[in-house]
Amino acid sequence: MTRIAITGGRVLTMDPERRVLEPGTVVVEDQFIAQVGSPTTSTSAAPKSSTPPGWQCSPASSTPTPTSHKSSSGVVHPMTATSSNGCTTCSIPASLPTQTTTSESEHCCTAPKPFVLASPLSSTTRTSDPTTSPAPGPPGSPFTDAGIRAIYARMYFDAPRAELEELVATIHAKAPGAVRMDESASTDHVLADLDQLITRHDRTADGRIRVWPAPAIPFMVSEKGMKAAQEIAASRTDGWTMHVSEDPIEARVHSMNAPEYLHHLGCLDDRLLAAHCVHIDSRDIRLFRQHDVKISTQPVSNSYLAAGIAPVPEMLAHGVTVGIGTDDANCNDSVNLISDMKVLALIHRAAHRDASIITPEKIIEMATIDGARCIGMADQIGSLEAGKRADIITLDLRHAQTTPAHDLAATIVFQAYGNEVNDVLVNGSVVMRDRVLSFLPTPQEEKALYDDASERSAAMLARAGLTGTRTWQTLGS
């Protein structure tokens, strides 16, 4: 049996009582949390002889915390970061096929690696990754190597819309030398591929890797495609995800809002994780609550693409479970959940002119226990409680930006940068110790990864006719 005792710091438990133990101790035995409590009551479960050296934290300097769960993100397009600057929501799906068709298999293998590297460095240990096509080899293999959790959400379009052809043609004209790739596929083809992915890869790597169906957008997926995803979630995968109401065009296509359309089809349920949900009204929110649909809000992505601001305070007021996602690098340029937590808090304060509209405590809940609820794992992760999986981060608050740290929740949300994350455990295994990742133990290996990703990105964008550069664009005279 492997035992680890993390002692000496404040423990943010996120348990039902939201206890903050100061000082506190978390005892880990193999994959599970054995005890959470004061040093005197907990350390007896882990004798010093079994405790790895160095896990004694300086008083008030390190905060053991449940790991963050990014409820929706994307990993295929870190290779295209900043290339979408100035694009709107609708132009992103139209332009990405041009980029993706230039991706060699090696690029698809390299692209997730910077994402995987950045995730634990800024607190994230579980992510949902919607992607339109299977990566070469085992989906999630970079996640397997890194030791973090991942949901490989197989995104698909099986009902392309003629209404978008003019828009796609206009955008494609900007890169006439690029070969356009049609990402749509027949429903039967998609479902056969999804069946194969689930059979081969779901619940692999000690259960850390999951495969979900992910019909892309209601107005570009057939009724058959959506109902099949719902049935697969109920019988095999426990969850499914979809982009919902990110852009107002979804309402125009169906002459009703997307949530109402999904309700009409019987496709709202408690296994659905709906991403974005920007252009929705009070009826839509009531439907989400009625069916216990989970929401992944993407504040930075929605701001980056000028999509709008999701009515998160209204969702919370109605009792809807909301988690936080970063979205992809092509519409965020970062995968730093801690910095996105601050953006989420500030945009709603500004939009409502109400400094108490979302509290830092609620933001922390959305990033931890509510994020776990979004992916159906609140009984296993999301809080530091005996019997749960040992998914834990420690934050070193001895930095200029986090000094002083009077209020723990406010410090994490409003002061932290993300580089305060010092240690990461997933399933009881050490993924990062003193900011050294277990899968990249030397600076040379880390630098080689950055160099490889940069070179492949430049080559990919060049073949797509997207140089990644543009003239300096100022405003005014």
UniProtKB/Swiss-Prot annotation:
Name of the protein this chain belongs to: S-triazine hydrolase
Family in the record: Belongs to the metallo-dependent hydrolases superfamily. ATZ/TRZ family.
Pfam families: Amidohydro_1
Enzyme type, top EC level: hydrolase
Coiled coil residues, start to end: none
UniProt xrefs under InterPro entries: Amidohydro-rel, Metal-dep_hydrolase_composite, Metal_Hydrolase, MTA/SAH_deaminase
Species for this entry: Gordonia rubripertincta
Region (Disordered): 38-77, 120-143
Domain of life: Bacteria
Pathway annotation from the record: Xenobiotic degradation; melamine degradation
Keyword line: Hydrolase
GO molecular function per UniProt: hydrolase activity, acting on carbon-nitrogen (but not peptide) bonds
Annotated gene: trzA
Compositionally biased tracts (Low complexity): 38-73, 120-132
Function: Hydrolytic deamination of the S-triazine substrate melamine.
EC number(s) stated in the UniProt entry for this protein: 3.8.1.-
